[in-house]
Regions:
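Extracytoplasmic/lumenal domain signature
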Residues: 1, 10-11, 16-62, 74-80, ...
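Residue-level signal for short, function-critical loop segments
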Residues: 7, 86
Length: 204
């Protein structure tokens, strides 16, 4: 079994006394016969102290990169495709707001396709905090489809309101992108996406 991890810790940043943030997104492989951990893949480095807030509270980063949805299994390639969310605190990292391919046997990250760089967002951002990103997580899983021409691709929808077509056979290379809605912290594509042949085949 493959278990993703996400967190609402970014909402705690609104408390001036809260030491924010130390959550790290991950995927864990468990042995279904006894529940033992086979491997665990962290998606962001260990947070470290980066400064002190105006309230005198320690600040930590990097953090975040939660996985809000189930991984997509590609048994033929032996890969898991994982859709990630934003960073909660600086510094921003290259695995946030991204589609990642992990080796199913080891958890090793095989490739990363980040679609929104520098997206750092927490609960202080709506109050005008500096250096805030757009909160454009991938909250829905990527869909592995076969296009009309027989080509396999990954289709992933983001809170930005953009759908992306990626090539799983070529390191997640971006094939196309299409805006289908208005993005935002509660907009775009969040908790699911239908499989549509017109989108998968043409990106339009």
């Amino acid at each position: 079994a493959f278990v993703p991890a996400a967190s609402w810790e970014e909402t705690r940043a609104v408390d001036p006394a809260y030491v924010c943030c130390t959550f790290r997104g991950s995927v864990t492989a468990l042995n279904v016969s006894d529940g033992s951990v086979v491997w665990k893949s962290w998606l962001v480095d260990e947070p470290r102290k980066t400064g002190v807030s105006a309230a005198g509270t320690d600040l930590y980063g990097p953090s975040g990169v939660g996985v809000w949805s189930a991984p997509t299994v590609d048994a033929r390639r032996g890969l898991l495709y994982v859709a990630t969310g934003d960073n909660y605190t600086h510094p921003a990292t290259d695995k946030s707001d991204a589609i990642l391919a992990l080796d199913m046997k080891s958890g090793r990250i095989v490739w990363t396709q980040q679609t929104t760089a520098g997206d750092v967002f927490n609960a202080t951002c709506p109050r005008g905090a500096p250096n805030c990103g757009p909160d454009h997580d991938f909250a829905a899983p990527a869909i592995l489809v076969r296009a009309a021409n027989g080509r396999e691709m990954l289709v992933a929808g983001q809170k930005s309101g953009v759908v992306f077509g990626l090539d799983p056979a070529d390191g997640g290379r971006l094939l196309w992108q299409t805006r289908v809605g208005q993005g935002g912290t509660a907009g775009g594509i969040q908790w699911g996406m239908a499989r549509m042949s017109i989108v998968a085949s043409t990106g339009s």
